[in-house]
Amino acid sequence: MSAILPTEADRRLLSDIKESITDMQQQMQATYSNLADLKLVGESHDKTVRITMTATYNFEDIEFDERALQGGVKEFKWRIREAWKNLCETIQKTTQSKTIELLQSMRIPEDIRNLSVEEEGGEGGEGGQGTRGMIGNPIASGG
């Protein structure tokens, strides 16, 4: 069996893919670092309890005023739970938004984008297609 040698175009494409992956990793690390610096607040419905964390779930502070203690321990725990839930939802929305921004701003070399176009004309179905046809395809990649 003889080995198939890669063409110059294949080597260039592989180089573009490697460079693109490295860029993506660097952008993801920068985004995570920015999220670590972003402080978010969750509040109870009556605004008597406030919990502050970073977007990477590092605890910063919890604040409450005397009104938060009205109704006893059960009510106080309920307000804390409410503020925590509000904070978690805020963190999730923020990280999702930042992730979408990151993905939309990523530079994808034209050769890689064209992979899906070239593959669409070929054979479909199973048989090791893997993720071919998904790169640069907003429907296949969930966007």
From Swiss-Prot:
Sequence segments annotated as region (Disordered): 118-143
Q: What is the lineage of its organism?
A: Bacteria, Pseudomonadati, Pseudomonadota, Gammaproteobacteria, Legionellales
Biased-composition ranges for Gly residues?
124-133
What are this entry's molecular-function GO terms? DNA binding
Pfam entry (one)? YbaB_DNA_bd
Organism equals Coxiella burnetii (strain RSA 493 / Nine Mile phase I)
Protein name as catalogued: Uncharacterized protein CBU_0658
Q: Which domain of life is it from?
A: Bacteria
